[in-house]
């Protein structure tokens, strides 16, 4: 599938993550604390002291907060959900973390050019209505030589892999049933293949892309050229 087809295919956002739905999501993902800590450590290994980091679609802010605990980084999060921006701000204040969360669209980031050293987008890219525009925006706000990391579900994740993933979340029976259904009948349908990510990366301004595979998803590493734009 060509990048132009991918852009038209994704002409929706799915359910708006506001109010009670956002609260339900935050409650369940809070149980993934170990995953957020591990992801934060992987990212911190890529960062110099004082690095400026952007999380696109941080949701309740759990990953950004764990990353902020690991070093003197300048952390910013942009999410389209006002509920998530409020939650993330409250969670950061409770953790005594200096991080800024603001409302905005991944396809029109309310940020200046060449501001960040590193960008991460976890479990959200498949929901963007304009994925190629979002990639271009990530490139725009990265400094020369900066990196971006997209972590997301793969569209061929098996039912067994999904079941195992949900089991590891240790949810209650109702929440586990709903989460399995959402993964299998909503999120997997929106997710991309390895080839999809490779084509989008090739069509983007990024100088280099490396894709790492796991049973449930992909880590897509993108690098901006070190040449001044």
For every predicted segment, state its role.
Residues 32, 151-204, 210-212, 217-220:
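C-terminal alpha-helical "lid/dimerization" subdomain adjacent to the S-adenosyl-L-methionine
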Residues 52, 146-147:
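Short glycine-centered segments of the SAM/dcSAM-binding site in methyltransferase folds
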Residues 120:
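A conserved beta-strand element that flanks and buttresses the S-adenosyl-L-methionine
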Residues 126-127:
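A short His-aromatic
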Residues 132-144:
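A short glycine-rich, Lys/Arg-flanked "PGG" loop and its adjoining helix->strand segment in the class I
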Residues 219-229:
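C-terminal lobe and adjacent flexible extensions of AdoMet/dcAdoMet transferase-like proteins
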